[in-house]
Amino acid sequence: GEYASRVELIRGCDVIPEPVQWIWPGWLAAGKMHVLGGAPGTGKTSISMALAATVTTGGRWPDGTRSIAGNVVIWSGEDDHADTLAPRLALSGADLTRVYFITDIREGSDRRSFDPARDMEPLRRKLVAIGGVRLLIVDPIVSAVTGDSHKNAEVRRGLQPLVDLSASMRCALLGITHFSKGTG
């Protein structure tokens, strides 16, 4: 049936420990997913734009440490890049030459919306071509989930391609989420 043909195991004594690589030491790890959540209107997008500005300029983090300058890629299903995100980034002092917005997918002369379930490989190729991507922001992170966002298994399945992309590119993945009523 639908059983795995072989499960791979590794003994703990055979694991070679690797240090965590940090974008912002102690806060944003390279190749890992991070979630910034809060009630609507509490500044989540503003915080993420400030983080993006710090990365693009090689600026200082709130704790005074300096960021290594790099590129930032943003996929937003809620805010428009022209009237909201780019202006907020500019106000945050971002180097807009280092910011890239995922807009759509071209298939020949046709365009369609970006679909994480089927477009990770074209996105990975684009990120490799850009080079130096240190931060990938997805707002809201639930937009990467094609199934029921209230079912843990479907959420994990939907997010896994982004998590894998982040790990392979060694960039931090920052997902923005809104608390539902009664959970804040």
Predicted ranges, named:
Residues A30-H34, G70-N71:
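Pre-Walker A (Motif I) flank of P-loop NTPase domains
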Residues V35-L36, G41, S46, V73-W75, ...:
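Phosphate-binding/switch region of NTP-binding enzymes
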Residues A30, A129-I130, S168:
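Alpha-helix termination/capping residues and helix-transition junctions
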Residues I47, L51:
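Hydrophobic positions on the alpha1 helix immediately C-terminal to the Walker A/P-loop
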Residues T56:
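Gly/Ala-rich phosphate-binding loop of Rossmann-like dinucleotide-binding domains
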Residues P19, W24-P25, P40, R60, ...:
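Conserved inter-motif catalytic segment of the P-loop NTP-binding fold
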Residues G1-I23:
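N-terminal pre-Walker A segment at the start of P-loop NTPase domains
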